[in-house]
């Protein structure tokens, strides 16, 4: 048997973190078993669906690298198939027409609540029975699935173990509305059957749907897939993760400067574990992943942990991979890397200081863009009269260099210290402010080497002009 999993979001909003984790788990399980992963868009809610949401889901999946083997399938393109299966159940007396109006059902529900009974649809209730008997062909009706009245639904959840629900707790589910459109629980079953889905991995909020769906599988004569229901994700305050906890959309994490590999690594550990290991390559995730290692307990989202992972991957990933994802952030700042050093070299130098790609983009502009002003605080502290001579000597030595290497630039700074009998800070900090425009950067000799001789010379001259003007206005 080929294992086949699916991710089946509804296009009513963005791809959120909980959905992304479900997609990741489904993708990993399929890959770990040499199986296939299907993407299905469950768009039967015609009032709330949007193409924008579909695009956001596809963009989020592609950004995470969760490529699908089949799909995306759209439920709205399969209505003929659903109606065929509804008609099959009607013909076999496993479904029936219900003519009870919404007003009548509300009235019956109110009676049940007043009598301290569990509110539910009851086909044998006198008022509902009378409405059905009085109806004529052509009157508006829904189609209800005839749920078994006796026995229980039992299934072995791969995360939670044995689950048993009595059929007496379930009423006759609507499977087709009065407008002719099929409902979620029915479409899901037909889709999973037609698409050969063997394992359904989804959130625990679907547990109540599962016994209903199992009864429909069996009524259709379809194989029942294996189920695994993942616990919810909580915010750091213990409440269910929501917008008030900050970013919950996958693409918001892209915008905030996270690498897909970091978010995937974080999400896989948000409920699944392999000993105490924290860092997992994609290959390790695939090789080690198993459903029975997923926790039954809810997991709390920890942004500090995600930041730590992101910093790890910025430092240790192939700079070409980091550059690929950094480009979007550079575009937002209109930084053109064609006019400067190789971006991979800059990433190697600056990356380990950054927790996000936003920070990285913020810190590398001076490699590619000239500036006409220095950071006010840094200039006030370091571009003073006392820095004039060290900068002048450094400028002369820099201009005289014939081989522009980090080693030679390091020697220039050392020679300035020796010649003027000053400490490293007396030239290092003024030089840093001169060539970067600010007071923080990696080793200034390495920075100068990447910026290039022409720009370094011009910036030191600009710093000297700044000092001269400052002294003149003193």
Curated annotation (Swiss-Prot):
A biological process term (GO) from this entry: glutamyl-tRNA aminoacylation
GO cellular component, one term: cytosol
Taxonomic lineage of the native organism: Bacteria, Pseudomonadati, Pseudomonadota, Gammaproteobacteria, Vibrionales
Motif 'KMSKS' region positions after renumbering to this chain: 240-244
GO MF: ATP binding; glutamate-tRNA ligase activity; tRNA binding; zinc ion binding
Keyword Isomerase carried by entry: no
Catalyzed reactions per annotation: tRNA(Glu) + L-glutamate + ATP = L-glutamyl-tRNA(Glu) + AMP + diphosphate
Main localization (coarse): cytoplasm
Origin: domain of life: Bacteria
Biological role: Catalyzes the attachment of glutamate to tRNA(Glu) in a two-step reaction: glutamate is first activated by ATP to form Glu-AMP and then transferred to the acceptor end of tRNA(Glu).
Keywords carried by this UniProt record: Aminoacyl-tRNA synthetase, ATP-binding, Cytoplasm, Ligase, Nucleotide-binding, Protein biosynthesis
Enzyme Commission number(s) from the entry: 6.1.1.17
Motif 'HIGH' region, residue numbers: 9-19
Ligand binding (ATP): 243
Protein name: Glutamate--tRNA ligase
Class of the enzyme per the UniProt entry, highest EC level: ligase
Family assignment from sequence similarity: Belongs to the class-I aminoacyl-tRNA synthetase family. Glutamate--tRNA ligase type 1 subfamily.
Pfam family name, one: Anticodon_2
Annotated localization: Cytoplasm
Entry-linked InterPro entries: aa-tRNA-synth_I_cd-bd (IPR045462), aa-tRNA-synth_I_codon-bd_sub2 (IPR020751), aa-tRNA-synth_I_CS (IPR001412), aa_tRNA-synth_I_cd-bd_sf (IPR008925), Glu-tRNA-ligase_bac/mito (IPR004527), Glu/Gln-tRNA-synth (IPR000924), Glu/Gln-tRNA-synth_Ib_cat-dom (IPR020058), GluQ/Sye (IPR049940)
Keyword Aminoacyl-tRNA synthetase: yes
